[in-house]
Amino acid sequence: MGFGDLKSPAGLQVLNDYLADKSYIEGYVPSQADVAVFEAVSGPPPADLCHALRWYNHIKSYEKEKASLPGVKKALGKYGPANVEDTTESGATDSKDDDDIDLFGSDDEEESEEAKRLREERLAQYESKKAKKPALVAKSSILLDVKPWDDETDMAKLEECVRSIQADGLVWGSSKLVPVGYGIKKLQIQCVVEDDKVGTDMLEEQITAFEDYVQSMDVAAFNKI
């Protein structure tokens, strides 16, 4: 298993393809699996790898919480497609000072029993909350205006990037291109969200992260269902 060399374009392409139908490396919530792969990537993937870029920006937003994310961080070869081998070079093998700080949490060998216990408790609490289904789920129908930079922006690619955003409680609907003048068209796209899971701020943050295509995003209509 693996993604090839995640520091190379080929490795990032494997990661992008892997995330085409997934929100996370493993499971349905961010975990130490995402942290392990995130650490191996040199920086934000290029805009044309919209699935990988969407995932990268999402995991980056968990920077302060990464040490407490559930799961156990494993070697890169434990993640990814089964038919691809991990060849990513680890920068930690060349030099590792005693004063180095692991921003994403301790290594498994150094992790204290107390830290393990707390992490397992958090995971159990999350699973317990997830199992309790609310009697009524509040939903909203939102119409978004997504504006490109100019008339040369690839609107098909822009829409692909927008629809690549996946989240629990988010369902994309119909869309159309609407002229705004000077040959420029904006993307008007419908979505239905669960109010306690997805907000317009989150949508705006993730959509405008595709900055090579998107100039801005506005809420054109918002209706409770």
UniProtKB/Swiss-Prot annotation:
Keywords carried by this UniProt record: Acetylation, Elongation factor, Isopeptide bond, Phosphoprotein, Protein biosynthesis, Ubl conjugation
Cross-linked residues, Glycyl lysine isopeptide (Lys-Gly) (interchain with G-Cter in SUMO2): 147
Pfam family, any one: EF1_GNE
CDD domains: EF1B
Positions of region (Disordered): 79-98
Chain positions with Phosphothreonine modification: 88, 93
GO molecular function: guanyl-nucleotide exchange factor activity; translation elongation factor activity
Any GO BP annotation: translational elongation
Ubl conjugation is among the record's keywords: yes
Subunit structure: EF-1 is composed of 4 subunits: alpha, beta (alpha subunit of the eEF1B subcomplex), delta (beta subunit of the eEF1B subcomplex), and gamma (gamma subunit of the eEF1B subcomplex). Interacts with elongation factor EEF1A1.
Similarity-based family: Belongs to the EF-1-beta/EF-1-delta family.
Cross-referenced PANTHER family: EF-HAND AND COILED-COIL DOMAIN-CONTAINING FAMILY MEMBER, ELONGATION FACTOR 1-BETA
Protein name: Elongation factor 1-beta
Lineage, uppermost ranks: Eukaryota, Metazoa, Chordata, Craniata, Vertebrata
Gene: EEF1B
